[in-house]
Amino acid sequence: MVKLRLKRCGRRQRAIYRIVAIDVRSRREGRALRKVGFYDPIKNQTYLNVPVILYFLEKGAQPTGTVHDISKKAGVFMELRLNHQTKFN
C-alpha cells in the first residue's frame, strides 16, 4: 500500500518537509516512489504537484493526516471530485 506522507529534510531547528509517495512499510527517511511536493512550516510555503497527487489518490494511495490537511487547503480534493464527476457524465 502506498501513502502520501511527509519526509523531513533541512537542518536542525529548520525543518523542511518533502511530500512523497512512499510504501507503508518504509521508514520516514526511506526511499520514496516519487516526490510530489514540499512544505515549509516556518515560511508557510507549500508546493504541490497536483496531477501526480491525483494520480496516486486515484490508484488508492492514502494521505496521512497532515498531508490530507495541506492538500485540502490547496483544493486537491475539489479537483479529485471534479475529475470523478466528469468521468460519470
Swiss-Prot record:
In the record, what terms sit under GO molecular function? structural constituent of ribosome
**NCBIfam families, sorted:** S16
The protein's organism comes out as Morus indica
- The superkingdom listed in its UniProt entry is Eukaryota
Q: Which GO terms describe its biological process?
A: mitochondrial translation
Q: Where in the cell is it found?
A: Plastid, Chloroplast
What protein does this entry describe?
A: Small ribosomal subunit protein bS16c
Q: Does the keyword Chloroplast apply?
A: yes
An example of a Pfam family matching this protein is Ribosomal_S16
Q: Which family does it belong to?
A: Belongs to the bacterial ribosomal protein bS16 family.
Q: Which GO terms describe its cellular component?
A: chloroplast; mitochondrion; small ribosomal subunit
Q: Which UniProt keywords apply?
A: Chloroplast, Plastid, Ribonucleoprotein, Ribosomal protein
